[in-house]
From Swiss-Prot:
The gene is nfxl1. This is NF-X1-type zinc finger protein NFXL1. SMART domains: ZnF_NFX. Residues 830-879 form a coiled coil. A zinc finger (NF-X1-type) spans 269-287, 322-341, 375-394, 428-447, 455-476, 480-499, 507-526, 674-702, 715-733, 777-796. Belongs to the NFX1 family. Disulfide bonds: none annotated. InterPro entries: NFX1_fam, Znf_NFX1, Znf_RING. Signal peptide: none annotated. PROSITE patterns: ZF_RING_2 (PS50089). One of its GO terms (biological process) is regulation of DNA-templated transcription. It is found in: Membrane. GO terms for cellular component: membrane; nucleus. Residues 1-120 are annotated as: Disordered.
Length: 914
């Protein structure tokens, strides 16, 4: 829908008068002076009377004068001109608003930081809510949540979570799937296609019958963790798997349901995760369990379930496998280590003895057994062994070499050959041995047969034991579906492709390094660092995402140098683009008054450039406003200057640039001729009479007030007479007042109260009851209601202690407070105090000595630096006079010693006074 000014006057005939048949025509009328110029065509300059300026126009134009009659066409043209002007004004306002918005957006880095802080605060609240149940078990310890917290932070950060299959960002409103092995997040359609393609590639060499019999796995694109085909994701669940299609909630972790996770911890301990539904691995179990150590000798202690296995560090003392020694290692997990000791042990046959580890008592020597077998004719040919040697291997029924005949012969005789043909299968597994029964292996097959090559394309007659391979190269495509086999005489089961894949990965930066394969390549394993402007904050993203990933928000301070007269910029965060304008105080010295400029820095103020060519009319496209950075002059000085008002009532601070006589707007206040009132006019200039600056002048007003003479000090009532000069009559009104103790109300005649002396006034204002006030010692005053402070002569019994507070007695309160009675320490107290003083003195002396040594070392180091290297051209006749150690350091030693002595002296007399 177009704006009204665009809809009005559309078409080529805009500005023409409408015909009588097409619509109502406007009647001619007078043309105002402001619209006279509208009767000329656009671009023809005119003067204020509607006459074309001389020397302008298009040659000999007919628009040279304004004496033309006013017609309907002229009135219509004026209306169109007004619409055009309105259109021009609307465009101008829109451009100004756009420029203002652009300037605000360009210099709103502080607002962006405030928005970032709000987002960070919201994220912190969600994280705290997610980890509340866990931190309540760990007393606020977050050290075990570092890995899980990283996954949760990446879930909140835009562009941080990337699907490795399609190399695209994972958004909050997209269905996702999380791997249970590496916890990587993928788009649901991407992982479904990946699983389908992986199963197809694995099962493609098989027949249709075998395909249904096996459940071929598919791997995770990142960690290669294998899943069954039945585990292919088909529905979108939250991280904990409780809610299907979790709703999008801005106050929850993206793709979570907000419920407690309740997944079992790994390794399984019987407890479940306490966090709210979250990405990434579950943290270690925070539950407390009571468990004993590995050797089960120590008492059970409460420990975290995730670290429940512990060692008491006591010797294990379990019997080792050797059954002779005990384990000396500290309490440990699992079986004990083999015995580390060495002992003399016999071999299995018992002939040899050797020093061997106690953990391996069984060993064999290299000698043949040699024992006589039960037959009595042969000896045992086994290597050193345990137990009986067994029967003679040549005794009992034996077979001939071809295994066709059995013989029962003594062990001393060999089995003869039977004379029959051997008939054993040869190595070719097709023919049998044609020789007579013989000892030893059969010969190779020498029969000639018609052999077919491995690929089945050629045949040839040749010896059976020789293989036949033709020279034909296989033309089949390997399993990668890209390269030919080209193996000579291939059997059809072509080997896998051994070339490198080399296809460009989804990142468009690297090529696949794997062996040539079918289907999609695995995602690029590389990561790219996306840095902020100062390169201190780095965000690792999968390769290929660096072009679309926004740089991370850096919290470091911007290090760009200042471009104004200030030495350094205000502290603000690292950013791209120009720095925000300086907001520091200008502090330039003003020319007129030498004060410092207090306004914000204006060296680089953004000012709209003036003097640009203006459009001649609405038909021209207005040029975009241009802003330039210009140093503005300092504003007028606003430093307050003390200035006296006209009536000399006050000295008020006025701005430095406007300091001068002024009216303070107060009443004049000078005493009038009556002597009772003052001038009530607003502060004005007064001419002094006879040099008296306290009397009213001729400019002051006359007195018209009532009597305002001062009453007696105790009388609060006004005089009812008009203003007069003599004394006022006595006051007879009753006054309600409080007694001295402020408890009872007393009614006294105003005259009596005001005319009474101090003693009589004290009696009049007393309620004659006991004073309720509390003395400084804490006891109640015993006197009758009285004026002033209570007496401090308290006779209440209180407890008194000696200075070291070892001895105590009961004494009168006033005597104790005035210090007339004191309880001195006895000899026991003095001994205790003396020992304490000696210990303190030793500590102070040690501190003084240590300080002296430190100052000595610093002084020597300082002098060594001052001396520097000796010059080679130093005169030989100079004699260096060395000062003694006391002359060098007596100042540095005496000052701390005197200070410590003064402090000890003051402390001692303070304790004595107490």
């Amino acid at each position: 829908m177009d704006a009204p000014w665009r809809q009005a006057g559309r078409g080529r005939a805009r500005g023409r008068a409408t015909s009588a048949s097409g619509g109502s025509s406007q009647a001619p009328g007078p043309v105002s002076a402001s619209n006279r110029n509208a009767s000329y065509p656009r671009g023809v300059p005119t003067d204020g009377n509607g006459v074309q300026r001389p020397g302008t126009g298009w040659g000999n134009s007919t628009y040279a004068s304004a004496s033309k009659p006013v017609t309907t066409e002229n009135v219509k043209r004026e209306t169109n001109e007004e619409n055009s002007k309105k259109k021009f004004e609307e465009i101008q306002k829109a451009n100004q608003a756009a420029v203002k918005k652009l300037a605000e957006d360009h210099y709103s880095s502080s607002d962006d930081e405030d928005g970032d802080e709000d987002a960070d605060g919201k994220q912190k609240k969600i994280l705290a809510l997610t980890f509340t149940s866990y931190t309540s078990q760990t007393d606020g310890d977050l050290s075990e949540l570092a890995r899980t917290q990283q996954y949760v932070n990446e879930a909140f950060q835009a562009g941080a979570v990337t699907c490795l299959i399609c190399i695209a960002s994972v958004k909050r409103n997209q269905a996702v799937w999380s791997c249970s092995g590496c916890f990587c997040i993928f788009h649901m359609p991407c992982i479904q296609k990946w699983a389908k393609d992986s199963v197809f590639l694995v099962s493609s060499p098989l027949t249709d019958d075998d395909f249904e019999k096996k459940d071929y796995p598919w791997p995770c694109p990142k960690c290669r963790y294998e899943y069954k085909r039945s585990e292919t994701p088909c529905r979108y669940y939250c991280y904990c798997g409780k809610v299907e299609d979790p709703p999008l909630d801005p106050w929850l972790v993206p793709h979570s349901c907000g419920q407690v996770c309740e997944r079992e911890f790994k390794p399984t301990c019987g407890h479940k995760c306490l966090l709210l539904c979250h990405p990434g691995p579950c943290p270690p179990c925070p539950k407390m369990v009571t468990i004993t150590c590995f050797c089960q000798k120590a008492k059970p202690v409460p420990r975290r379930c995730s670290a429940k296995e512990w060692s008491c560090q006591q010797p294990c003392r379990k019997t080792l496998m050797c059954k002779q020694h005990k384990c000396e290692n500290p309490c440990h997990k699992g079986d004990c280590l083999p015995c580390p000791r060495v002992s003399k042990q016999k071999c299995l046959c018992g002939r040899n003895v050797a020093q061997r580890p106690c953990a391996s008592p069984t060993w064999q020597c290299e000698q043949v057994c040699g024992k006589t077998l039960p037959c009595g004719n042969h000896t045992c040919e086994k290597i050193c062994h345990a137990g009986p040697c067994g029967q003679c291997p040549r005794s009992g029924n034996r077979l001939c070499p071809c295994a066709k005949s059995k013989y029962t012969l003594p062990c001393t005789e060999d089995v003869p050959t039977c004379g029959d043909s051997c008939d054993k299968l040869l190595e070719c597994a097709l023919h049998k041995c044609s020789q007579r029964c013989h000892r030893g292996p059969c010969e190779t097959c020498r029969q000639e047969v018609e052999k077919q090559c491995r690929c089945g394309k050629h045949t040839k007659r040749m010896p059976c034991h020789k293989p036949y391979l033709c020279e034909t190269k296989c033309a089949k495509v390997r399993d990668c579906q890209r390269h030919q086999c080209k193996r000579k005489c291939c059997s059809g089961n072509c080997p896998g492709c051994d070339q490198q894949c080399g296809r460009s990965l989804g990142c468009r930066n690297h090529k696949c390094p794997s062996v040539c394969h079918r289907g999609s390549c695995y995602p690029c394993p590389e990561t790219i660092d996306v840095k902020c402007n100062c390169s201190k904050t780095v965000l690792k993203v999968p390769c290929g995402r660096e072009r679309t990933t926004k740089p991370p928000k850096c919290k470091e301070v911007c290090s760009c140098p200042s471009t104004c007269h200030h030495e350094a910029r205000e502290r603000h965060r690292c950013h791209f683009g120009p720095c925000p304008p300086c907001r520091q105080t200008c502090k330039k010295i003003l020319n007129r008054c030498s004060h410092l400029c207090p306004v914000p820095c204006h060296d680089e103020a953004l000012v709209k450039q003036k003097g640009l060519p203006q459009p001649a009319g609405p038909w021209e496209q207005p040029s975009e406003p241009t802003f330039i950075q210009t140093a503005l002059p300092c504003p007028p000085c606003q430093v307050p200057i003390p200035t006296e008002c006209l009536g000399k009532h006050e000295i008020s601070p006025l701005p430095c640039h406007a300091a001068g006589p002024f009216s303070c707007k107060r009443p004049c206040g000078r005493p009038l001729a009556c002597g009772n009132h003052t001038c009530s006019r607003e502060c004005h200039k007064v001419t002094d009479v006879n040099g008296n600056k306290e009397r009213a002048g001729v400019e002051c007003a006359a007195c018209e007030e009532e009597c305002n003479k001062p009453r007696p000090p105790e009388c609060p009532h006004r005089c009812n007479l008009p203003c007069h000069s003599d004394d006022c009559p006595p006051c007879v009104q009753m006054i309600r007042t409080k007694c001295h103790c402020k408890i009872s109300n007393l009614f006294i005649e105003c005259t009596k109260l005001s005319m009474a002396d101090a003693k009589e006034k004290n009696n009049l204002t007393s309620c004659k009851n006991q004073c309720p006030k509390e003395l400084p010692c804490g006891h109640r005053c015993k006197e009758i209601c009285h004026q002033g402070n209570c007496s401090l002569n308290c006779i209440q019994k209180v407890k008194l202690r000696c200075p070291c507070r070892r001895i105590k007695k009961e004494m009168p309160c006033n005597s104790v407070r005035e210090g007339h009675i004191s309880l001195e320490c006895d000899s026991v107290c003095l001994d205790v105090r003396k020992k304490a003083a000696e210990m303190k003195a030793e500590e102070e002396n040690a501190a003084v000595e240590q300080e002296r040594r430190r100052q000595q070392a610093e002084l020597e180091a300082f002098e060594n630096r001052l001396k520097g290297k000796r010059r080679k051209n130093k005169r030989k006749d100079e004699v260096e006079v060395q000062q003694t150690a006391w002359q060098k350091y007596k100042k540095y030693i005496m000052m701390p010693v005197c200070g410590i002595a003064l402090a000890v002296f003051t402390l001692y007399y303070t304790q004595v006074d107490v």
